[in-house]
Amino acid sequence: MTAKDILFDAEARTKLKVGVDKLANAVKVTLGPAGRNVLIDKKFGAPTSTKDGVTVAKEIELVDPVENMGAQMVREVASKTSDVAGDGTTTATVLAQAIYREGLKNVTAGARPIDLKRGIDRAVKEVVAELRNISRSISGKKEIAQVGTISANNDPEIGELIAEAMDKVGKDGVITVEEAKGMETELKVVEGMQFDRGYLSPYFVTNSETMEAELDEALILIHDKKISNMKELLPILEKAAQSGRPLLIIAEDIEGEALATLVVNKLRGTLKVAAVKAPGFGDRRKAMLEDIAILTGGTVISEEKGYKLENATMAYLGQAARITIDKDNTTIVEGKGKQEEIKARINEIKGQIEKSTSDYDTEKLQERLAKLSGGVAVLKIGASTEVEMKEKKARVEDALHATRAAVQEGIVVGGGVALIRAAKGLAKAVADNEDQKTGIEIIRRALEEPLRQIVANTGTTDGAVVLEKVKNAEGDYGFNARTEQYENLIEAGVVDPTKVTRSALENAASVASILLTTEAAITDVKEDKADMPAMPPGGMGGGMY
């Protein structure tokens, strides 16, 4: 077992604080509209320029192991806030540093750390309740655009694009972010359900210019097994041909005689038909086929359920207003399924998302949810250089997360003002002794820190003066660091998602409390590796034999 170094008491806490400060000081320069960029060296490729707190935090590893532990604890604040709310990572870091700094002064002066922690916890609970109280819900496109703009570091183009995407695919819809080939940033919306399977044969193409198979007012046959024998497919094919409507066949695979017969009939013009493989694998494939069936009002022909392909009737077939198939994707628009069944399926998937413990499963469930609830929007991010592209893409992803958070829990006034207004809730926090009262006051002081830092980053205004002016005002009145004016910030579009502000405070207080109640720090002893012994002189030892 490796030997360990142990630091106790003030020595441990002082070193932890150095680590906390190093990371927090690098992160907090990015806060607010006047925040600066941080340049990060990459061993391969160009350096990365970012104004995203969590990206900076994740890059920091310190040489001293105890200092590094302090830094990593605060990095956890940023990461957790990013995971939960998608934004607010810099605010969370600034709050954690302030709570730890103020708490440490009191611990050094003789306060009991555990009582400070209790006071901090009670204070945070009341501030969060007050934040929820002053929160307001958002619904309009304009409000969504404001949240997106602020979270994308005051880029109105990104805010407008996100609002447009949410407008098109709904609040539960999937919005993905991709790199564009050119310099333009644009929004592309795939309406209806799209899955990543193309036609099984190019002979199914109906539009030779676009190389797509287009089926209008189509019928859809959904089967969960391979189809290779034409005999079992023939009865339902004849019924579909009599209806005069085009037919899409979705199955695990279609091969041999069955595929050849479909192609020949398509080329002769006796049957408008196309065939694709079923999306997904294993249990996910079964679930996705069921989704398609519910969306189109059809039935999955599955022997597990007692259905046989040769006995299939027209009642088993789904229907859609339009189906477009290219070599890679199939898109079903306006499925004719019953709305109540689709809603029930959506609620079932939402329930599975809540219970899911795997990020991968959650992502796949959310994709299925989006396909059922209105489509997929793709934000294609364009830029003139790779460095700019990466930075812009990261900002768009942040803004997207923050906007979703705003839709979930509403918004509060931005610019650090919401935390100052929420300090009103501290009047309800009950302290059992003086140290707990001190814990409450630590939070009161820490709540001012984000505003102080936003002002400090402007480099032109005195933070103490701004703070006093904002504290003496009421409601949404605050300091707009972009214009350096005092105004109604909500009207000016300076807003933060409630979930972001709440998560930042809760996570900061949690980690700062752990650091305050730390009495010892244990690290591995660094081993000095001995120099390699010198090589013997040239030639083979011992001479020749």
Curated annotation (Swiss-Prot):
Stored InterPro entries: Chaperonin_Cpn60_CS (IPR018370), Cpn60/GroEL (IPR001844), Cpn60/GroEL/TCP-1 (IPR002423), GroEL-like_apical_dom_sf (IPR027409), GROEL-like_equatorial_sf (IPR027413), TCP-1-like_intermed_sf (IPR027410)
Keywords, alphabetical: ATP-binding, Chaperone, Cytoplasm, Isomerase, Nucleotide-binding
Organism: Chlorobaculum tepidum (strain ATCC 49652 / DSM 12025 / NBRC 103806 / TLS) (Chlorobium tepidum)
Name assigned to this protein: Chaperonin GroEL
UniProt main location, coarse: cytoplasm
GO MF term list: ATP binding; ATP-dependent protein folding chaperone; isomerase activity; unfolded protein binding
Listed HAMAP family: CH60
Subunit structure: Forms a cylinder of 14 subunits composed of two heptameric rings stacked back-to-back. Interacts with the co-chaperonin GroES.
Entry binding sites for ATP: 30-33, 51, 87-91, 415, 496
Annotated signal peptide: none
Coiled coil: none
Family: Belongs to the chaperonin (HSP60) family.
Pfam families cross-referenced by the UniProt entry: Cpn60_TCP1
GO CC list: cytoplasm
